[in-house]
Each structure stands twice: as structure tokens, then as C-alpha cells.
Amino acid sequence: MKKINIFLCAVMALFTSCSDVDLESVNFSEAVTNLIADYQDGKRDVTLSWTNPTMEGQSGIQIIQDDKDITNIDEVINSYYIQKAPTNTDVSYTVKARYSDGRVSEGQTVRLYINYEAKKGGNMVAMLVADDYTASDDEKDAVAWFKANYVDKGKGTLITPSTINDLDIEKHAACWVMCDRIGVAHGWANLPGGLASNGTVNALKAFCADGGNLLLTNHATQLTAAVGRIAEAYAPGIFGNGEGGQNNDVWGVQPIIGNAEGQIYDHSRHDIYRGMNFTSGLYERSIYTFEGAGVKGDHNCMWDLNAYGLAPEPNVVKAWEDMTNSTVLGTWNHVVDYCCAGIVDFAPTTDFPGRILAVGLASYEWNIGGENQYKDQLEMFTGNCISYLK
């Protein structure tokens, strides 16, 4: 067991006025001492321990990973367990004392590097939903389908942010993250029910770093930026969160991208569409259908490829794909040009070993307030996506 001890020397300065009256340092905040990190090569868990200040007024602890990920704990503790720390990279943890009047002490920092070889080999799939997923009819219906087809058959695990440590590369090949919520604000940091917490995001990062794959649907496509697969500047910009309304049109996905000669990208035979009905007569081109008449939320969370300043030649789809090492597999059912990316397959890279399949089309909807005549197509598509990532 490796132990890293850090001892800080406090330097006290005494200031006196002309009248020899001591000036009390009323803002002094005693720091923690004796910070230790216990860990072992080949394992991901780390235990931090320290000695708390002796002065009165301490109300909690602040732990900072790599000078950016902050965890505030509203109780006085002297140890903290990290089940899945970053591996094969330099990482730092800083511990600070928090006080009831709002003061935060200077921190002690420990730095470590864990050598770890992922034992990838699982073939199960996990589904991650918000702790409060029952607040969404769409999320509830998706979970019910996943339970019946994967959990109950021993092929899957349902997890939430409160059980995120159950996500395990030795057990799971892929993880489906689903969030479809009325009223949620734009931006991944606003995802509900713990999906945007440091613990959740770090667990997804670690899973992908070990070669695990993600299926991100609906509002969860924003996690492409959270986990670092794309820059924040390229996060999904087409966004909807309203209550929606009755709509009798058939909605789905257009897998043929573009209309310029020599620049038409036909993905209609891709594995994610295997076995589905390619339906003609509804729009200019045939589409794969997801939903019929019903109450549609219109919750897009996808990419406007004209909004990022991409090179227009030969087209913005090609520019996006080259920049992000991805493939645009689908757009809105009525679109025949290059404007938008509704389904994007982000291929593994040297820096990001996991594959991410992002489905941000509003038509990918699990509850439309009644019977969906194309529910079998939606379910087949979802199963295909999961199989593609396994």
C-alpha cells in the first residue's frame, strides 16, 4: 500500500502597531494537516485521510480533484473514499477545511499516479437514468422496456447516479444514458437527478477511458461535452424542453445525408437501422419511423452544423466529421441538405478509447400520451444501437 504524506509548515508573522497593540488575525482559517492518500497499483480505489483543524467553527470539508472538480461535504470528516479514481495519469487531490461563517482554509494537496490495466470483457449493458427518473413519462417507459428486455433476462443493469459505482468495465460493454425532461435548462450542467454531478461524470469518463461505450439519447447527448469527447463550444445547440402538443405527423429519422452530386452520404444500411421498415411516401425521401400521431414533446438536443463556423466546402457535415472523428448517421426526417446532425457516431480515438453514439432527435420519444403505432420500430432501433455498441 502506497502512502503519500504531506506536512505543511505554518509561518506565523507578528505585526505590532505604533502603540505595541497586537492586531488579531480575525480571518485566519486553520487548514487540515497530515494528508495521506492510500492506494495500490492495479486497483482504482483511493482513500484520503487527514487531521482536521483544532480551532472552533469547522463545518465541513472541500475536496478538489485536479484543481477543477469540487466536492463540498457538509460535515466534519477525516477520510474520504474514492472508488474509481483516474488511472494511468497524474491526478491531484486537495483537501480544505470549511467553516460555518463561510471561510475556506488553504488546502493540502496530494499527487498520485495509479498504474492500471482495465480488464475489459463484460458483455452486459447498463442503463443510467436520473435519480428522479419517475418524474418523466418518457424515462419511465424507456426504463420499463430496458428492464423487461435486459435486466429481467440477466443482460443488463439499471443504475442511477446514487449507484453509479455499479458501472463496471469488467461487467458492462456499454452504458445507455437516457434523459428526456420537460423544463430542463440547456447545458449538460443542468441535467437533473444527479446526472451532472462530479461523481457521475467522472464515472462515465473512467468507463470510456477503459474502452466502454456510451449510448446518449435525448437531453443526455450534452454529456458528449461533459465527458470530454468534444469541446464545450461544439455541444448540441438545437434544444427543446417544452410540454409539446398534439401532432398527427409521422416522425422518424432521415439516414441519407446531403443532396449535392458526389456528396450524398447514404447510411440507410447501417447496423443501427437493421431490420427496420424504410418507409416511403411521407417525405421527399424514405425514412425510418419512430412515432405516429400523439402528444409530441419536440425535445431536440442535436447539432446545428451551420452554427460552428465550419468550412462550407465540400460541406459542413464532412467538416464536422473530419474535425470530431465521427459520422453523421441521421438527421430530421424532412431534411435533405447538410444543416443538422441528429444521430452522431463518435468513433474511438487515442485519447478517448470509448465509442459514443448520440441520438438527439425529438422523434426519439418513448411516451406520446397514447398508443404509438411505430413503437416496435423505436424499440428495434434502440436494441440495434445497444447491439452496435456491445
Task: Show the residue positions of the predicted features.
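Beta-strand-rich modules
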Residues: I82-S105
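Helical hinge/lid and interdomain linker segments adjacent to catalytic or ligand-binding clefts
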Residues: M124-G237
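Solvent-exposed loop/turn segments flanking beta-strands in beta-repeat/beta-sandwich domains
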Residues: P53-D67
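An acidic, glycine-rich "communication" segment
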Residues: L216-V336
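Extracellular ligand-binding/catalytic regions of CAZymes and related secreted enzymes
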Residues: D20-N27, E117-A118, F239, Q246, ...
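C-terminal motif of bacterial Sec signal peptides marking the signal peptidase cleavage site
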Residues: L14-S17
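Short beta-strand segments within Ig-like beta-sandwich modules, predominantly Fibronectin type-III
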Residues: T71-I77
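Pro/Thr/Ser/Gly-rich low-complexity, intrinsically disordered linker/stalk tracts
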Residues: S19-G57, T87, G102-K119
